[in-house]
């Protein structure tokens, strides 16, 4: 078994006091493309754990007519909207890829909105603990999502596995997948930020076998947190 398989990392995540008032334990779930974040999220959800998905929130905060989309329009111009008034994601994606400073400006608008929406969902959670899933939980430090978490769980996989899964799932070319991976931390760097790392190289049964003891640990930690807060 790999030393990274469902064991605490010696470089444990040490966040500041979580920036939310909930007594609920928040586990940040992250990992590179094709590492199995969705499979892990689905398993936790099946155990009755509330899942906050940063990708879903990122889409929700820029829906047609939203305050965040209006801010983006004022900042960049009407071209960010398509003929239906929705955000033209392809145009915006091309623009920020061409002009890196534009990405910084865009994230200065979207990240606070994503963070606030995540905090609202945390406040509404009723499960013993919450999983906050974010592909760039560590990379996008300025978004502040990692500081909402008391613990970080990293899904880990070799590059070959990532490429195989992502190409099968998303029908992406190897070149496109590698371009995405360039903007993500390396496995080694990401694992340094983790409290727990699951090496996801086999089938779902093997993955679930690693997640079960972590789930039990998180239930215990959640109880401890609530007792300490009372």
Curated annotation (Swiss-Prot):
Pathway: Cofactor biosynthesis; coenzyme A biosynthesis; CoA from (R)-pantothenate: step 5/5. The keyword Aminoacyl-tRNA synthetase does not apply. Keywords: ATP-binding, Coenzyme A biosynthesis, Cytoplasm, Kinase, Nucleotide-binding, Transferase. GO terms for molecular function: ATP binding; dephospho-CoA kinase activity. It catalyses: 3'-dephospho-CoA + ATP = ADP + CoA + H(+). ATP binds at residues 34-39. Transmembrane segments: none annotated. It is found in: Cytoplasm. Its EC number is 2.7.1.24. GO terms for biological process: coenzyme A biosynthetic process. Belongs to the CoaE family. This is Dephospho-CoA kinase. The lineage of its organism: Bacteria, Pseudomonadati, Pseudomonadota, Gammaproteobacteria, Moraxellales.
């Amino acid at each position: 078994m790999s030393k990274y398989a469902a064991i605490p990392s010696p470089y444990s995540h040490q966040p500041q006091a979580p920036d939310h008032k909930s007594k609920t334990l928040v586990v940040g779930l992250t990992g590179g493309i094709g590492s199995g974040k969705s499979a892990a999220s689905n398993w936790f959800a099946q155990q009755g754990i509330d899942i906050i998905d940063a990708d879903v929130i990122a889409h929700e905060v820029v829906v047609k007519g939203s305050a965040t989309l209006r801010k983006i329009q004022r900042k960049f111009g009407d071209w960010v909207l398509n003929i239906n008034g929705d955000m033209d994601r392809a145009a915006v994606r091309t623009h920020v890829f061409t002009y890196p400073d534009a990405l910084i400006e865009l994230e200065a608008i979207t990240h606070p909105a994503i963070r606030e929406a995540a905090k609202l969902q945390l406040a509404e959670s009723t499960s013993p603990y919450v999983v906050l899933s974010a592909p760039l939980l560590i990379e996008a430090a300025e978004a502040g999502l990692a500081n909402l978490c008391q613990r970080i769980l990293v899904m880990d996989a070799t590059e070959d596995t990532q490429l195989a899964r992502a190409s099968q799932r998303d029908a992406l070319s190897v070149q496109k997948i590698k371009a995405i991976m360039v903007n993500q931390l390396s496995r080694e760097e990401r694992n340094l930020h983790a409290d727990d790392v699951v090496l996801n190289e086999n089938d779902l049964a093997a993955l679930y076998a690693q997640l079960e003891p972590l789930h039990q640990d998180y239930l215990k930690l959640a109880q401890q947190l609530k007792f300490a807060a009372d």
